[in-house]
């Protein structure tokens, strides 16, 4: 009786396509004023390939609703319009904190129109970027090379093939004597005491101090008597009132009542928010983290239901 073993694969699963690591990926950051206009987004995607370009909103990135993959993007382009100061104003420290780790080494951050000013570019520099050609680049971290610190080996000067140095054989045991004196072993160098060079007058002389380092004499505030009649008590009270008024003016905070708060926000769907107002136009105008990815276009405000895996508009 012969036994045959079937070694063929029963289920042949298709191999998933591998992404090309050399393909450059782009990230577009859109403020609400740009994302709300369909024609502006259409012009942008006519320049960049949609398959290698991601679109994100400033407010979602700053609020932490979106997490960017690390070391992914080669170019980060900030979309601008006539109100370019809006995009610059939205480049806060929270945005740089989420954006810089997602940039590859050598990746570039730039505006679609114009460039960042000195004050706005300071946040980019503090985040680890380097200014270059009107934009900012993420520097390439060079690998540290360890240095070998060690003394150089002494070379024996021999004048023969048998290891004879200056007429003395070095192959055998060393001989103690005047001829074998090693100057390198003499570490008893004569040191000079620096304090012995100073005279008594030099030690009594005060140390010179720079003008800005001279300590000020402590001044105690005079306290008025319990039954003060000279006017010192009223003078100190005036100074205290002026100091409190100035502190209250510096800490002037705008306070809102409950009626002043905007109650038009709808929090019925937890985690599903939209800031670009272009979700109804289709996937071409939706950001990468849009909850409506894959759904057909619909009218703004129209209720969308999914019943039995079918979209009901």
Curated annotation (Swiss-Prot):
Tell me, what is an example of a GO biological process annotation in this record?
iron-sulfur cluster assembly
Which keywords belong to this entry? 2Fe-2S, 4Fe-4S, Cytoplasm, Iron, Iron-sulfur, Metal-binding, Mitochondrion
Cellular component GO terms, alphabetical: mitochondrial intermembrane space
Instruction: Give the start-end ranges of region Fe-S binding site A.
Output: 213-230
Subcellular localization: Cytoplasm; Mitochondrion intermembrane space
Principal localization reads: cytoplasm
Give a yes or no for keyword Secreted in this entry.
no
In this chain, [4Fe-4S] cluster is annotated as bound at 276, 279, 287, 290
Summarize the protein's role.
Component of the cytosolic iron-sulfur (Fe-S) protein assembly (CIA) machinery required for the maturation of extramitochondrial Fe-S proteins. Part of an electron transfer chain functioning in an early step of cytosolic Fe-S biogenesis, facilitating the de novo assembly of a [4Fe-4S] cluster on the scaffold complex cfd1-nbp35. Electrons are transferred to dre2 from NADPH via the FAD- and FMN-containing protein tah18.
Q: Which family does it belong to?
A: Belongs to the anamorsin family.
Q: Spell out the protein name for this chain.
A: Fe-S cluster assembly protein dre2
Source organism of this protein record: Aspergillus oryzae (strain ATCC 42149 / RIB 40) (Yellow koji mold)
